[in-house]
Regions:
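HDAC/HDAC-like amidohydrolase catalytic core signature
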Residues: 1-207, 212-356
Length: 356
């Protein structure tokens, strides 16, 4: 399996995260991508290539133009203030408050940011831009292989399912149409899915297996029927992002029925998780999905510091095998996973399970 990777992820190297009432070093940091890449190489998963640049058009196809402009200049504006730290949202437009965008950068950070664990630091925009290129390069490679019959997976045989791994960092599934948060700035998986739609793929499904609900992806496609969004995640009554991901959120207008949420309680083990996972796979099959995008978070792992599921490393092999059974061209887009010791093992287990 080909892996897409950019060294520019290192430009996103924030020093602070607000967690448990304290400013702590961020769980989402450059070592995550390094560890996954190291495992990809040590297991000889396949060739690792750099992304090509796709420009701004795919970003603006999904994200609000003023929001994108804010991300581009936020650090520059913040660094011109008297503040010494990183840009952390501290004041939001809550219930019955004006939804007008402030002029001052402190207000704009709160207007566009929905959670305070995610700061904007120097290099954030450049890293986010490269991360979406990683996702788009994977989508392009998968599309070309699908059109030409070229094999990009191993083993090289007629029955192998095509798969590509986009090692994105920063992650993206919490980034909404006009909001950042949850370590996410641009929605890599959504941008890739829309690019596939714009390039002739009629029916795309996004399967989100991250522990946290992908509120951003849901927000972007909630009123559409051409992109199916499915998510298994910690029950938002107990887990971030708290205000998105309930089972009765199924879409609106033309999109009714094209969103499928499976919130699960603390302590969920693989059997319970897998039963719901198989329901998602059945819906993907029934949707006549042409290309599958997997938001690949492995923070469902039992030792992850910011989740409460109990999946074990071997379970991730099973996840990959079950996805492969769909026999759909599949783009894996890296999302969360914060147990540094076994992060690489768990990610590559999914990919190896898919290819075995």
């Amino acid at each position: 399996m080909i892996t897409i990777y950019s060294e520019k992820h290192r430009l996103r190297n924030a020093k602070t995260e607000l967690f448990g009432g304290l400013l702590v070093p961020p769980y989402e940091n450059p070592s995550r991508a390094d560890i996954v890449l190291e495992r990809v190489n040590s297991e000889k998963l396949g060739e690792v290539i750099a992304p090509r640049e796709f420009g701004m058009e795919p970003v603006l196809a999904l994200h609000d133009a003023e929001f994108v402009e804010f991300l581009q200049v936020a650090w520059e504006e913040w660094s011109q203030t008297e503040y010494e730290g990183e840009a952390i949202p501290t004041c939001w437009p809550g219930r019955r408050m004006s939804q007008r965008r402030p002029d001052y950068i402190d207000g704009k950070v709160g207007y566009y940011g929905f959670s305070s664990e995610t700061s904007i630091s120097e290099g954030t925009w450049e890293a986010a831009l490269a991360s979406k290129d990683v996702a788009l390069t994977g989508a392009e490679l998968l599309l070309k292989a699908n059109e030409t019959g070229m094999s990009i997976s191993t083993p090289l045989n007629a029955n192998s399912t095509q798969g590509v791994f986009s090692l994105c960092r920063p992650p993206g599934h919490h980034a909404a149409f006009d909001m950042f948060g949850g370590y996410c700035f641009l929605n890599n998986a959504a941008i890739a899915a829309q690019w596939l739609r714009d390039n002739g793929i009629e029916r795309v499904a996004i399967l989100d297996v991250d522990f946290h609900h992908g509120n951003g992806t849901q927000d972007i496609f909630y009123d559409r029927q051409d992109v199916l969004y499915l998510s298994l995640h910690g029950d938002p009554r107990d887990a971030f992002p708290h205000f998105s991901g309930y089972s009765d959120e199924t879409g609106q207008d033309a999109g009714v029925g094209a969103t499928f949420n499976c919130p699960l309680p603390p302590g969920t083990q693989f059997k319970t998780w897998c039963d719901k996972f198989k329901e998602c796979l059945a819906k993907i099959d029934q949707f006549d999905t042409e290309v599958l995008v997997v938001s690949l978070g492995v923070d469902t792992f039992e030792k992850d510091p910011i989740s409460f599921f109990k999946l074990k490393s071997d379970d991730f092999l099973s996840i990959g095998k079950l996805i492969a059974d769909l026999k759909r061209p599949t783009l894996f887009v890296m999302e969360g996973g914060y147990d540094i010791k076994e992060l690489g093992i768990n990610v590559v287990n999914v990919l190896q399970g898919f290819e075995d």
